[in-house]
Amino acid sequence: MDFKVFGKEGAPSLLLIPGLGVSYEIFLPLIGLLEARFRILAVQVDGFTLGTFTRFTSIDDQAAQVIAYVKERQGGRLDCAYGLSLGGKILSRVLERNEVVIDHAILDAAPLLPLPRWLEGPLRYYQCANVWTCYHWTGFWRRVFHSHYFDVLLDECRKVYPFGGGRAVLDGYKSVFPVGIQIKVVNIFSFFNNSL
């Protein structure tokens, strides 16, 4: 994992975590608008770093690296953090571990659905079956995604797929916030307007 830093020292901090298959460059237009007023930390997720080879191992590993960086470089505190898609899932794990203080967290299109318990198993099997069939029947996903990342994804699918004996991992829909984080919906624009 790599971090790109923009903006001035001492300004309110803003962490940006991109989604699957993209680098921090997806945020460059936003960074251009906000770097005069914020200290922006843009994450390059393992497996999608530009210019260096890295391997994506797990969402928990990515969250641990974000936490370590925030503790070391930001004193364990952020004013705002934004996670897009997979970045939102990583950010949810950072929040779940409760090791750093984040005043405002925005999880955009993160795979966090409030589902009834009885629906967790069937949905997990359904998702794994989709990935499994796409991989084995067309090979499409292996061409789209970094091959090592896809191998990790398939390993997770094998744990819950019927042939894997149903060894489900605690991920995705099963228990997103085991430490009881309360989510408060706020107007995110008020944060940016007050800070601008």
Regions found by a protein language model. Give the residues of each.
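Conserved HGGG/HGGXW glycine-rich cap/lid loop of the alpha/beta-hydrolase fold
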Residues: K4-T52
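Structural signature of beta-strand start/N-cap positions in the alpha/beta core
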Residues: S13, R39, L78-C80, I102-H104
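Active-site signature of alpha/beta-hydrolase-fold catalytic machinery across serine-
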Residues: P29, R93-R97
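Gly/Ala-rich beta-loop-alpha elbow adjacent to hydrolase catalytic centers
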Residues: G83-L91
